[in-house]
Curated annotation (Swiss-Prot):
Keywords assigned by UniProt, alphabetized: Antioxidant, Disulfide bond, Oxidoreductase, Peroxidase, Redox-active center
Disulfide bonds: C130-C133
Keyword Disulfide bond: yes
BP terms from Gene Ontology: cell redox homeostasis; response to oxidative stress
Native organism taxonomy: Bacteria, Bacillati, Actinomycetota, Actinomycetes, Mycobacteriales
Function recorded in the entry: Antioxidant protein with alkyl hydroperoxidase activity. Required for the reduction of the AhpC active site cysteine residues and for the regeneration of the AhpC enzyme activity.
Catalytic activity, as annotated: N(6)-[(R)-dihydrolipoyl]-L-lysyl-[lipoyl-carrier protein] + a hydroperoxide = N(6)-[(R)-lipoyl]-L-lysyl-[lipoyl-carrier protein] + an alcohol + H2O
Identification of the protein by name: Alkyl hydroperoxide reductase AhpD
EC number: 1.11.1.28
Organism: Corynebacterium aurimucosum (strain ATCC 700975 / DSM 44827 / CIP 107346 / CN-1) (Corynebacterium nigricans)
Active site (catalytic residues): C130 (proton donor), C133 (cysteine sulfenic acid (-soh) intermediate)
Subunit structure: Homotrimer.
Top-rank EC class of the record's enzyme: oxidoreductase
Amino acid sequence: MSIENLKSALPAYAKDQKLNIGSLTRSTELNEEQLWGSLVAAAAATRNDLVLSEILEEAREHLSEEAVDAALGSATVMAMNNVAYRAKSWLGDDFAQVKFGLRMNIIAKPGVDKATFELWSTVVSAINGCEHCLSAHANTLLEEGVTKEQIWEGIKVAGVVEAVAQALQAEAVRSAE
């Protein structure tokens, strides 16, 4: 049980995150594919090897290999898009009409249904701090019939997985001293 491994590795000051990640993995707000893909996409977005490997191990019990690839693909394409769209926003109106010019074919054919991939893209955009992408994907989800509560559940996954990764990274540095 890899989530259990993460929970066991968390220090006392991260008890809230231990409880939060346990609760999220039992959530019924999202279906199994949405939930476990959100966990995988969030773990990839944290760039923390331990968090990604532990979550991937357990996620494979809940996801097809195609869904795992789609979740990892979401994290990858959103890493690029979040940087580019944040930069366009910061650069102002002079850059608004500049051609984006980057490939993102996975968005059109992700290997899972559109709403699921959009949810995972929302999760990653929350971690990466891209307001433009977060809003755009959340609006698409609403248009696809996904509820605000389901979107928020994805955001909760993003926040908790990021917090778990941060605590484990802090402890890795601390133990290396």
